[in-house]
């Protein structure tokens, strides 16, 4: 029984923790579920985000309680209830495949739907065993310490979630973490057959929507609606496989030129510009002016339609160029809307949420003279 107990504890602690450090990632996965089941409009987005945070807190707490042998009735009952819900759900996911993966371990460990179902069968058996033998669980700490551990556990996981939500995840398991080379992440090993992707563009004219590709992109009389990346032929899939930057004005693919630029380039990432936080827009405009002054590139990346981009420009006075990119890719790049990423020759040097942007006290000289990888708003520049 103790083997089952510690197995459940380890899995729940790990699962809860990786969700807590990336609450927006969990939120996006919940949105995927609701969209797949046709339930996206049933609840407001703030409730979906709250559910993501509460779920991570419950999983982490259950794991800690099982490990220390405290709150035994609560922990064993909740563990069993979670597995009663998740096991048949993941069986359905394995059979119907409405989402690519369950997201049970976030981006830290991606399992196929069948692997997830097999894992949940084992955990369900363990949960039943622990529930039946709950009274035999040995407590490792005193009753007084149990109360303190319980309170600290809840406090820790909620503070962690809200900190990572307000800033960026303290651990980045995605292929776009600081220090990664985007170009290398897109490379196909010699001899491997690459997957074939195609960018699809939906544009509208005279009330009629039509789909285009880069080969037949229409003239400026058409209004852009959205873009998406479509898998045409499955092959070897590199860690980064859908990074494509297309100019809004010309329809030109700028991916290679931006990733090959030997200078610094700021990328303002806003997966849906109409939902982006505009509280720090003056600072964003200052960073753009700084980029122009020093000859650095600056592009805004979004998947929003052209009319929403124009509304953003009118509201914020934005003068920087806009480019189109796949919505899922933008969400993967940075967990902030908007967020800012600094790259050079395809290497990610730093990322900032809109709450931690570098300001005029830091961005005074050339980036060659400052420790850009440690820039933070209202902080002195730290040495590398």
Predicted regions and their residues:
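Membrane-interface segments at or immediately adjacent to transmembrane helices
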Residues: 160-253, 257
């Amino acid at each position: 029984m103790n083997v089952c107990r510690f197995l459940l504890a380890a899995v729940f602690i790990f699962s809860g923790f990786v969700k807590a450090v990336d609450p927006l990632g969990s939120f996006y996965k919940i949105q995927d579920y609701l969209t797949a089941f046709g339930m996206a409009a049933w609840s407001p987005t703030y409730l979906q985000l709250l559910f993501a945070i509460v779920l991570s807190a419950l999983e982490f707490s259950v794991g800690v309680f099982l490990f220390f042998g405290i709150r035994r009735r609560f922990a064993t009952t909740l563990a069993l209830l979670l597995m009663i819900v998740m096991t048949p759900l993941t069986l359905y996911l394995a059979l119907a495949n409405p989402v690519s993966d369950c997201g049970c371990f976030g981006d830290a460990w991606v399992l196929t739907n069948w692997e997830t179902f097999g894992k949940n069968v084992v955990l369900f058996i363990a949960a039943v065993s622990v529930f039946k033998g709950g009274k035999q669980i040995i407590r490792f700490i005193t009753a007084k310490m149990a109360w303190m551990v319980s309170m600290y556990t809840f406090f820790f996981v909620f503070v962690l979630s809200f900190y990572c939500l307000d800033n960026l995840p303290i651990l980045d398991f995605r292929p776009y973490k600081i220090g990664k080379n985007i170009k290398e992440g897109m490379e196909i090993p010699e001899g491997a057959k690459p997957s074939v992707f195609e960018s699809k563009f939906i544009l509208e004219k005279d009330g009629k929507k039509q789909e285009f590709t880069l080969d037949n992109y229409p003239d400026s009389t058409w209004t852009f609606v959205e873009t998406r990346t479509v898998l045409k032929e499955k092959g070897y899939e590199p860690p980064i496989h859908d990074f494509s930057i297309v100019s809004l004005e010309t329809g030109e693919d700028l991916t290679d030129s931006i990733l090959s630029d030997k200078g610094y380039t700021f990328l303002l990432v806003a997966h849906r510009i109409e939902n982006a936080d505009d509280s720090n827009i003056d600072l964003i405009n200052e960073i753009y002016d700084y980029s122009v002054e020093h000859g650095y590139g600056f592009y805004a990346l979004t998947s929003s339609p052209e009319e929403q981009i124009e509304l953003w420009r009118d509201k914020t006075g934005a003068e920087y160029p806009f480019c189109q990119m796949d919505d899922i890719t933008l969400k993967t790049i940075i967990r902030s809307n908007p967020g800012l990423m600094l790259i050079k020759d395809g290497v990610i040097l730093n990322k900032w949420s809109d709450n931690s942007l570098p300001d005029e006290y830091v961005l005074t000289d050339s980036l060659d003279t400052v420790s850009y990888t440690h820039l933070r708003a209202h902080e002195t520049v730290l040495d590398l």
